[in-house]
Amino acid sequence: MSANHHFLFITTPKDWYNSRITETTKELIRVKKHILHISLLRIAFFLAGIAAIIIFFHAGTWVLIGAACCTFLPFLILIKLHNRLFARKEWLETQLQINQEELKGLEGDFSDFDEGKEFANPEHPYSFDLDLFGRRSLFQAINRTCTHIGKETIACWMQEHLTEKTLIELRQQAVRDMSERHEFREQFRVMGTVNHGKISDEEEIRRWSESPSDLLQATWVKLALWGVPLINIVLLAGGVTGMCSMSWFGLVFMLFVIISFAIIKRATLVQQAYGEKLKTLNSYAKLITLARQETWKATKLQQLIDRLNIDGHSPAEALMQLSKELDRLDLRNNQLLYVILEGSIFFQLRQVVRIERWKERYGRHLMKWLETVGELDALCSLGTFAYNHPEYTYPSISNKPFQFVATAMGHPLMPAEQCVKNDAIIPSRPFFLIITGANMAGKSTYLRTIGVNYLLACIGCPVCCKQLTLYPAQLITSLRTSDSLTDNESYFFAELKRLKRIIDLLNEGKELFIILDEILKGTNSADKQKGSLDLIRQFMHLQANGIIATHDLLLGTLADQFPEKIRNYCFEADIKDNELSFSYKLREGVAQNMNACFLMKKMGITIQDE
């Protein structure tokens, strides 16, 4: 029964992955049995061939040839069949692993997926604060790419989110379309993984594709490629007809072999520097072929496929042609064949010229093709994320600056049974939410929940909300500032630099969505209060929007100065029967209960009653 037929009865992602695991496991068992049977047949035919040679050794040449053909020919056919079965086995094992990983991901276990920790950057405007990269990060939850360029693309999207309504809606449409193509996403990922489409040296390939093709313009190259085979033909014909001695042919032939050593360096450099890297383009060719077979509904996906077109043909053909030309360079490893080909036609020089001609014709398109495949790969990941969360909703992107209205919003990385959902309303510009509350009451989690959902919305993904409407301004946060020993920079100064950056961007007219946690943490209370109050007043003057969490209840008085522009909310800690509890539900107003002294007493620290 086909996967499509099965899907008619499947209602959840968990059912789908379980179904694929069951089907793949059954087929894998069958393939392994076939491999075993073929192995036994190969042994049988090989032994039969040896026996036939011994038995019919004196029976005549034709009988011996016939016996050998009846045994060794099937043996060779079985080798080819065996190789196909092993390739199928690798495909199925990868497919099984991918579906098992997705099933674990649905349970919140992302340990099998790439953390993207190389992208972590404390200086980034928001990625470090929102835990976008690293263990149990948003990147680890989303990234399912099978190409290095795809992985880089997702990281780039997360670090430089979209801020235009039209572009976000086009991305949303593409993610929706991709999320519905379960088999395509699975095949794309399996194919990329099996074929090791991991080009990690894009810049080297870019340099190669953009470098001048000097050999094509060299006169000596043209003369050598035409002259060497022509001279060989003339001398060989002369030797055969008796017009000259065959020794002349042999002497000149060996001279050509020696000369080839002098010019072989260029071929060796091409092979060593780019050979293995360029050969992986074959896997990109297969991914391109797979993508072009689909009929896409989304405009963005149609545009990407249109980019995978050159003179009415698929670039897959050109990439496979390059792969074949590079494979032929490997003939130099066969010493006997190498000597014959070099002496006859300057084979390696000829191959390098063919590769240079390919580069001259297609080189300017190469990076565009790879980047397009990388974007398709990234969209596959976003589509998988959307499919895995059918309860999420696609946000409505507003033209009204500024707006952020969320209903029942939760953190996408928090287990559903532990996730307490809250609303958020920022209806206009300028406008700030001031969030007060006790320690551990949920303020920081609330800020990250807003930040992560805001980012998901701005990269075209569905969000962990019942409903979300937002205006896509540039996100900037200050939640987790740290000391810098290498820069001799204090905690307080590091935060000041971040705040100055925000003010500078606002003065430049940038539209920002600002999320701050506990402003001016590194200074004394009086300074902190005055500085915080003045900073928020400046935000109001600069028409800014955002959310600020604080322990300082005095900031709640700003709502009296800006009754239409600032709103107070809080997370309360409830103390009952000498026990502390948290509801993690957002409430209107300024927090009334603080828990620091209570917790200190619980830990055995003496607190003097007033």
Label the predicted regions:
Residues 2-438, 445-475, 497-498:
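Alpha-helical coupling/stalk and coiled-coil linker elements that connect catalytic or binding modules
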